Swiss-Prot record:
<comment type="pathway">
    <text>Cofactor biosynthesis; pyrroloquinoline quinone biosynthesis.</text>
</comment>
<keyword id="KW-0813">Transport</keyword>
<dbReference type="Pfam" id="PF12706">
    <property type="entry name" value="Lactamase_B_2"/>
</dbReference>
<dbReference type="GO" id="GO:0018189">
    <property type="term" value="P:pyrroloquinoline quinone biosynthetic process"/>
</dbReference>
<protein>
    <recommendedName>
        <fullName>Coenzyme PQQ synthesis protein B</fullName>
    </recommendedName>
</protein>
<keyword id="KW-0884">PQQ biosynthesis</keyword>
<dbReference type="InterPro" id="IPR011842">
    <property type="entry name" value="PQQ_synth_PqqB"/>
</dbReference>
<comment type="function">
    <text>May be involved in the transport of PQQ or its precursor to the periplasm.</text>
</comment>
<comment type="similarity">
    <text>Belongs to the PqqB family.</text>
</comment>
<dbReference type="InterPro" id="IPR001279">
    <property type="entry name" value="Metallo-B-lactamas"/>
</dbReference>
<dbReference type="InterPro" id="IPR036866">
    <property type="entry name" value="RibonucZ/Hydroxyglut_hydro"/>
</dbReference>
Length: 303
């Protein structure tokens, strides 16, 4: 299984266009040792030719341009994208579908809840019908694994996760299973197994057991502290209120990952305020000490 990190930042990317927090300002003036990052998206393949796109970020055009296999050049119009899986209906995970309209129809897998959001509050399915029929919806059943024809060796198993639906969702304040999912992706040929959850608000014992059965966990790294945005003066909401489990503190993501000594552990969906973006920070050093990696744009994982 080939896993390509197309984008590793949370919504807004890094540096965020309108932000002058310590991280963003420091990156711009050259005082911060950090890498720029686009908004979270990954691609997965069983052969390195046909790819399943997991989330379509607003930065999708630049992300595809930076990864040569996404343009195999087999025809006058071509793409390496064979299917698209949406983990949720958030703007930073779905807006890229608009930029992919020239390639419609696209095969899109998502849950009933995500399809409802993207047919009402943010009606991408309706809008894109005008381009060669738009998006062909393939329903993700929460209790069933599924395969994608172009990558037959990969088995995808959805996992309903505790998180929050976006502000435009009809059930913003009435959470439903399927608002947000994680994925277990298993390569039936190599036996490699990936746990992928860029939006993760809580890890209970059953979920931890599933994570322990994976070779690599690629998980929510949005915030270091739950009140990080408040501390940085750029927001009023906590990580938990937005459906993200912070790394630091009792019950935080680092405590969770500490229970997975055998797995490769990688944080993704990093918010622009997170001090781990600073490669010289004590927080980054703590991750190194704990053998936890920070995803970056262009990172490749083979399982």
């Amino acid at each position: 299984m080939f896993v390509q990190i197309l984008g590793s930042a949370a919504g807004g990317g890094f540096p965020q266009w309108n932000c002058n927090c310590v991280n963003c300002a420091g990156f711009r003036d050259g005082s911060l040792n950090a890498q720029a990052r686009t908004q979270s998206s990954i691609a997965i393949s069983d052969d390195g030719v046909n790819w399943v796109l997991c989330n379509a970020s607003p930065d999708i055009r630049a992300q595809l341009q930076s990864f040569a296999p996404m343009q195999p050049g087999r025809a006058l119009r071509d793409t390496g994208i064979s299917a698209i899986i949406l983990m949720d209906s958030q703007i930073d995970h779905t807006t890229g579908l608009l930029s992919l309209r020239e390639g419609c129809p696209h095969q899109v897998w998502c849950t009933d809840m995500v399809h409802e959001d993207l047919s009402t509050g943010f009606p991408l399915f309706t809008m894109l019908k005008h381009w060669n029929g738009g998006l062909d919806w393939n329903r993700i059943e929460l209790d069933q694994s599924f395969t994608v024809a172009a990558c037959p060796s990969l088995r995808f198993t959805p996992l309903p996760l505790r998180s929050a639906a976006p502000p435009y969702s009809p059930h913003r304040f009435d959470p439903h299973p399927g608002d947000n999912i994680g994925l277990i992706v298993e390569d039936l040929g190599t036996g490699g197994k990936l746990f992928y959850a860029p939006g993760l608000g809580k890890v209970d014992a059953p979920l931890l057991e599933i994570m322990a059965g994976s070779d690599c966990v690629l998980v929510d790294g949005t915030m270091w502290d739950d009140d990080e945005m408040q501390r940085r003066g750029v927001g009023t909401r906590t990580g938990r209120e937005m459906g993200h489990l912070a790394q630091n503190g009792p019950g935080g993501m680092l405590e969770v990952l500490e229970q997975l000594p055998e797995q490769r552990k990688v944080l993704i969906h990093i918010n622009n305020t997170n001090p781990i973006l600073d490669e010289d920070s004590p927080e980054r050093a703590e991750l190194v000490r704990r053998n936890v990696e920070v995803a970056y744009d262009g990172m490749s994982i083979v399982l």
